[in-house]
């Protein structure tokens, strides 16, 4: 029997679907014969009592979640997410460069520092990559500080705003699609596959439609997912490390392009677990037993 801790924060349990997901992790642990407790920021001193830690809180190198990951690693405990995954995924420049080195297909991408955010550079990039362009701040999350620009003056205005948060920005080719694939992976294995279908006339999952409608999450059984989709997702995840990842992918004319690799991927009840309800047990098995517990999964 293993003693497992889930580090979370108060804001995480304000959402019913996330609270239910946390409960599902606990039920899965009990059914597998393990103990699982929720640990909050003011209870970190008790983490030494546990064998492994699952982080279900906002991750960033400046957040408590990163301290938890580093501490667990220094104590020799298994932890999700790893500190390496947090560092890489919270810096999109680092993440995209790793994907490029691993020859993972991504949209055409450029990195600009402050001196390059000019209308002249914008004109050249519109000619090279098309219109619109997507600008991203390196440390953005949940689609914040990610914007489309259609004119040089718009490019400069948004770029300079993003540079208040970082010393570089990411510029990418825009790939229009009706949905994004999300493949959740762990240690070279596929845990779940979903489609995030955008609201009408929207291009980001977090955007609501004109009538207030939200994006729709549709679960896809792992064995029904396109093999090339899974191959690309696993390659992208491996380019970061072997932690728990949510790989966002666009399908364009039968080709797959990685949009992002996310650490600490959302696992919400009735959404990411739709077609793969065993995801909770798989994560618990990994924490309690290690990578060998995932040998039966595709990957």
For every predicted segment, state its role.
Residues 1-80, 84-85, 117, 292:
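ATP-binding N-terminal substructure of ATP-dependent carboxylate-amine bond-forming enzymes
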Residues 38-40, 172-173, 182, 242-253:
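A short glycine-rich, hydrophobically flanked beta-strand micro-motif that places a catalytic Asp/Glu
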Residues 42, 120-122, 154:
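Short acidic active-site motifs
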Residues 58-60, 139-140, 264:
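Short glycine-rich anion-binding loops that position phosphate/pyrophosphate groups of nucleotides
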Residues 72-145:
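A conserved helix-loop-beta module that forms one wall/lid of the active-site cleft
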Residues 133, 189-192, 245, 257-260:
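Protein kinase-like catalytic core scaffold
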Residues 144-237:
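Phosphate-binding site of ATP-dependent enzymes
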Residues 238, 251-299:
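C-terminal active-site "lid" helix and adjoining low-complexity regulatory extension at the edge
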């Amino acid at each position: 029997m293993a003693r497992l801790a889930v580090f979370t924060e108060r804001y995480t349990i304000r959402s019913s679907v996330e609270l239910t997901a946390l409960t599902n992790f606990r039920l899965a642990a009990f059914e597998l014969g393990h103990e699982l407790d929720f640990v909050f920021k003011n209870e970190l001193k008790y983490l030494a009592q546990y064998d492994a830690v699952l982080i279900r809180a906002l991750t960033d190198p400046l957040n408590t979640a990163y301290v938890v990951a580093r501490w667990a690693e220094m104590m020799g405990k298994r932890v999700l997410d790893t500190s390496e995954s947090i560092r890489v995924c919270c810096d999109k420049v680092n993440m995209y460069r790793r994907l490029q080195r691993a020859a993972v297909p991504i949209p055409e991408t450029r990195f600009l520092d402050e001196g390059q955010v000019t209308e002249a550079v914008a004109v050249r990039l519109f000619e090279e990559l098309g219109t619109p362009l997507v600008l991203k701040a390196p440390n953005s999350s949940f689609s914040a500080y990610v914007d489309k620009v259609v004119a040089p003056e718009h490019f400069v205005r948004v770029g300079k705003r993003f540079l208040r948060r970082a010393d570089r920005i990411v510029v990418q080719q825009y790939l229009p699609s009706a949905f994004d694939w999300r493949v959740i992976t762990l240690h070279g294995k596929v845990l779940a596959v979903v489609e995030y279908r955008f609201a009408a006339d929207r291009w980001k999952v977090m955007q609501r439609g004109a009538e207030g409608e939200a994006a729709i999450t549709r679960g896809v059984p792992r064995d029904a997912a396109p093999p090339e989709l899974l191959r690309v997702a696993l390659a992208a995840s491996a380019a970061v490390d072997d932690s728990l990842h949510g790989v966002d992918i666009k399908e364009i004319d039968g080709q797959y392009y990685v949009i992002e690799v996310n650490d600490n991927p959302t696992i919400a009840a009735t959404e990411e677990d739709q077609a793969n309800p065993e995801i909770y047990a798989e994560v618990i098995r990994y924490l309690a037993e290690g990578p060998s517990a995932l040998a039966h999964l595709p990957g």
